[in-house]
Amino acid sequence: MKVYVLRIGHRPDRDKRITTHVGLVARAFGAHGFVLSPCDEKVLEKLRDVEERWGRLLEEIACTNSPLKYVKTWDGTVVHLTMYGLPVDSVIDEIRQKDKILVIVGAEKVPREYYELAHYNVAIGNQPHSEVAALAIFLDRLYGGAELYRQPVGGKLRIIPTEKGKKVVKVGEEGPSGGAPGVRAERGRGGRGEGVQGADEVRGHKRGATDRDLGDET
Amino acid sequence: MKVYVLRIGHRPDRDKRITTHVGLVARAFGAHGFVLSPCDEKVLEKLRDVEERWGRLLEEIACTNSPLKYVKTWDGTVVHLTMYGLPVDSVIDEIRQKDKILVIVGAEKVPREYYELAHYNVAIGNQPHSEVAALAIFLDRLYGGAELYRQPVGGKLRIIPTEKGKKVVKVGEEGPSGGAPGVRAERGRGGRGEGVQGADEVRGHKRGATDRDLGDET
């Protein structure tokens, strides 16, 4: 199965953060490609930065200024996430049988054509909430939760799950039993570092922070 | 089980949209209360507006300027969502046994105290993505997916899930078999209305749009 996420209707002047979250969710929840429309190099750059630091999970990061054409020429199944669609649980088993899936995530008003072009208009509940959440739940259902355990290729840092505080190791120093040699941030440390699972934590890491830096940046 | 979501570190000048998404996810994914810190009346107002239009799902919408005190005086279990925490799948069964759960969602850097105060630091995968997605997945795991089927109390509008386009009915006109009398938006309509499952769709509806308006606003 190959899954691409197409974010349409992105407004560079006001959607940067939400769209970045959409892209990061695509990456972290098992999509193979992320395509942004219209193009916004800053968002793509942020995603590439995350891939460089945390490892490669996406095969392609791209953009298009012809999103309708992109959808029309997609040689696979088209899924459009919308609160007006059919319950995800009623269609996910069928969708999971497909080879190539394009998941459309709208930003501003979604033109009528997308509803028509989509093979599946899928709702994650029928209440208004967030396209970020909708994409995460859709992919989580699609992969049955297995997406959370994918291991990235390369990159510089890995997190060792811990009860309190932060354990971050450099790639290559994880050690056979899960990080002993590379662990410099002691357990229970906490600190002011980027603990929140949000896009913002990425922002502070452009200078190639090691695990030591993670708790010390302000 | 009673679940509250506490959003901490909100920056009114730049987090309004993300925090609104967090609040809407809390509402749509089964939380009973949403507490914002620090206070930002505009975000709370938006949530109240959604509750008024789409029906009541939250029992409490509140804010606090003493978040640490709020956590310290919480007489229940404290969960902190962080990419450095333990895998959600390894702790969710235990958490599900608790009576009262406070879910902390950070925005900017999360102070060390929260890691210490939390009974569970929980990671939705150990990759950076989005606090909006993290909260959605956590609540989805907590409720085993049942949260998507909760019915709100009152409100003005209900969506009837549909294959293409939009079906929206006024509350009270749903009809016994699912909306026949109230359905004015015909199937296959699509249109430029707010189809995306995002907070933005809420914005255009302040004037009390009926289903007719839903597809016509620009």
UniProtKB/Swiss-Prot annotation, chains A, B:
Residue span of region Disordered: 170-218
Enzyme class: transferase
EC code: 2.1.1.206
Cellular localisation: Cytoplasm
Compositionally biased region (Basic and acidic residues): 200-218
Keywords from the named record: Cytoplasm, Methyltransferase, S-adenosyl-L-methionine, Transferase, tRNA processing
InterPro entries in alphabetical order: Alpha/beta_knot_MTases (IPR029028), tRNA_m1G_MTases_N (IPR029026), tRNA_mtfrase_aTrm56 (IPR002845)
Role description: Specifically catalyzes the AdoMet-dependent 2'-O-ribose methylation of cytidine at position 56 in tRNAs.
Catalysed reactions, as listed in the record: cytidine(56) in tRNA + S-adenosyl-L-methionine = 2'-O-methylcytidine(56) in tRNA + S-adenosyl-L-homocysteine + H(+)
A molecular-function term among this protein's GO annotations: tRNA (cytidine(56)-2'-O)-methyltransferase activity
Binding site for S-adenosyl-L-methionine: L81, G106, A107, E108, K109, V110, I124, G125, N126, Q127, P128, H129, S130, E131
Protein name (record): tRNA (cytidine(56)-2'-O)-methyltransferase
GO cellular component: cytoplasm
Subunit structure, as described in the record: Homodimer.
Membership in a protein family: Belongs to the aTrm56 family.
Highest taxon, organism lineage: Archaea
GO biological process: tRNA nucleoside ribose methylation
